[in-house]
A protein has these predicted regions:
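C-terminal motif of bacterial Sec signal peptides marking the signal peptidase cleavage site
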Residues: 3-7
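Zymogen propeptides
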Residues: 9-145
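Conserved beta-alpha junction segments in alpha/beta enzyme cores
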Residues: 59-62, 68, 72, 183-214
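Short beta-strand scaffold segments in enzyme catalytic cores
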Residues: 71-74, 121, 151-155, 187, ...
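Short, solvent-exposed aromatic-acidic interface loops
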Residues: 87-94, 167-171, 222-226
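Active-site-adjacent helix-turn-beta-strand microarchitecture at beta-sheet edges
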Residues: 119-200
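Conserved, well-ordered active-site substructure
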Residues: 127-146, 197-212, 216-248, 258-300
Length: 300
């Protein structure tokens, strides 16, 4: 009787089996090339939300082995029909809490058509008062910050986007240039450079970045707290993503169970015209009521 002995390959192709960084969309290709995060691309696709607004959905496994689902929304403010506005519950001026879908429905109207929406600032979960400033339609509703590392995202009266650290906000506010504004958390990028922050681990994230000329805005939404679906992102990783896609400055917004990204699915004014694209983690996929938000609007 003869015996045949088998052994494992001396040079197993573990990396070859794992690595798959082939991306089909321009945004995902930039993230693959610039972040070093993506080990295995599961899927990526880009679609046009409306003229001047492109959304990309990306699913991947990181080199650390974490599944990740993220959305990148690019807004072209040089398009004369497109604008970004701060939102409050019931399209009003009173601070309270309401889901982003309800905020979008309240603001949506002919000539002020909402195409996408995102949660924005951290807020008092009892009163709904945002932690940072709020400006709507050129009117300052709140100009103070709670303690801690805070920032602000704003749109100027000549329709340019910018972000500022809390220390720089008083001068910006005094200049009278702000048309829309919401508060945010830590700075992720400033003047093209990453800002080092004390890490808080992998979490669901909402964040916003702007180009140097203020005419392009990127929203990043990352789901988390669901091991098999998406684990979230760290601050440094968010910054790398913004840097890779071309942002000059970026800030973190409220995340966790507040993280929400919705889009309009039809130009008609049907009751179900808005769809939440991400997976809000605290309520099994159901939206959390939040203090304020940011809406992408067209005047057509």
């Amino acid at each position: 009787m003869s015996t045949t002995l088998w052994s494992c390959n001396d040079t197993p192709d573990y990396n070859d089996a794992y690595d798959n960084t082939t991306a089909t969309t321009a945004v995902a290709q930039k993230l693959v090339a610039g972040t070093g995060l993506i080990g295995h691309m599961i899927d990526d696709r880009t679609w046009t939300v409306t003229d001047g607004v492109e959304a990309t959905e990306i699913a991947y496994v990181s080199y650390e082995g974490y599944t990740t689902k993220m959305f990148v929304v690019e807004v072209d403010l040089s398009n004369p029909a497109i604008s970004i506005a701060a939102s409050l519950p019931d399209n009003g001026t009173t601070f309270k809490m309401q889901s982003m879908t309800r905020q979008a429905l309240a603001a949506d109207a002919a000539g002020n058509k909402v195409w996408a929406g995102f949660n924005a600032d951290f807020f008092n979960m009892t009163t709904g008062v945002p932690r940072g400033p709020v400006h709507r339609n050129g009117v300052m509703l709140k100009n103070t910050f709670d303690s801690g590392e805070r920032s602000v995202f704003y749109i100027t009266r000549d329709k340019k986007a910018a972000v500022a650290h809390r220390d720089d906000y008083p001068a910006v506010n005094a200049s009278g240039v702000i048309q829309e504004a919401v508060g945010g958390g830590v700075m992720l990028m400033t003047e093209g450079e990453l800002v080092t922050q004390e890490e808080e681990g992998l979490e669901p994230r909402t964040a916003v970045g702007v180009s140097e000329d203020g005419k392009t805005v990127w929203f990043l939404v990352v789901d988390g707290r669901n091991w098999s679906y998406s684990n979230g992102m760290r601050y440094q990783e968010l910054g790398l993503c913004f840097q890779s896609i071309g942002a000059h400055d970026a800030i973190n917004l409220d995340g966790g169970g507040s993280t929400t990204f919705l889009v309009r699915t039809t130009p008609e004014f049907t009751d179900d015209r808005f769809k939440v694209c991400n997976w809000p983690c605290d309520n099994g996929g159901q939206e959390r009521a939040v203090g304020d938000g940011l809406l992408i609007i067209s005047n057509q």
